[in-house]
């Protein structure tokens, strides 16, 4: 995956996994045009399929699905360190480590979200050097896989985006790390 494809893929995933409000809908045509440029056919087609699927929902129904899936679902939230430690003290250390990693890479995250919020992590992956993105996602690959599995079990339309993410991570050479594995 070349740099441009990586940046478009991770940026698009960050957007598409964000809250689907009016602003989100207004940006979709621009994202669709950018996604058309992705060289990897599988990733491009799955992202475009998500547009078709999400368009079959009314704006209100899509928001309801999003909120039910990510905001009310403890097992399907997008805070990837939550799978390891929930609200435990150890999570704070992981969050601080992530924030420091971002800053060391020149990425200054917003204070509106915790550093382990998946769309924010995807923004980082789009902006950072590939080695830094790889390092962050290697630690949490099992968490991303677990989230994808849970979304699939819930028949969420967002499962497809997580499968795109897993394919993109594999494409940039992300391999499993024991350190960040989901605890059974």
Curated annotation (Swiss-Prot):
GO terms for molecular function: metallochaperone activity; unfolded protein binding. One of its GO terms (biological process) is chaperone-mediated protein complex assembly. It holds the Pfam family Nitrate_red_del. Keywords: Chaperone, Cytoplasm, Nitrate assimilation. GO terms for cellular component: cytoplasm. InterPro entries: DMSO/NO3_reduct_chaperone, NO3_reductase_chaperone_NarJ, TorD-like_sf. It is found in: Cytoplasm. Its main location: cytoplasm. Gene3D superfamilies: TorD-like. Belongs to the NarJ/NarW family. Chaperone required for proper molybdenum cofactor insertion and final assembly of the membrane-bound respiratory nitrate reductase. This is Probable nitrate reductase molybdenum cofactor assembly chaperone NarJ. The lineage of its organism: Bacteria, Bacillati, Bacillota, Bacilli, Bacillales. The gene is narJ.
């Amino acid at each position: 995956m070349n740099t441009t494809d990586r940046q478009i893929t991770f940026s698009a995933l960050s957007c598409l996994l964000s809250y689907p409000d009016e602003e989100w809908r207004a940006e979709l045509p621009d994202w669709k045009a950018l996604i058309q440029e992705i060289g990897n056919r599988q990733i491009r087609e799955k992202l475009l399929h998500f547009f078709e699927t999400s368009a079959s929902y009314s704006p209100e129904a899509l928001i309801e699905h999003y909120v039910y899936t990510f905001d009310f679902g403890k097992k399907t939230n997008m805070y990837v360190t939550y799978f390891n430690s929930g609200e435990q003290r150890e999570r704070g250390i992981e969050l601080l480590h992530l924030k420091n990693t971002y800053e060391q890479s020149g990425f200054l995250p917003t204070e509106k979200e915790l550093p382990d919020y998946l769309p924010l992590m995807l923004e980082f992956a789009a902006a950072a050097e590939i080695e830094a993105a790889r390092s962050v996602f290697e630690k949490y690959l099992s968490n991303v896989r677990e989230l994808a599995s849970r979304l699939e079990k819930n028949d969420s339309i967002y499962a497809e985006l997580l499968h795109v993410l897993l394919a993109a991570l594999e494409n940039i050479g992300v391999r499993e790390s024991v350190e960040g594995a989901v605890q059974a």
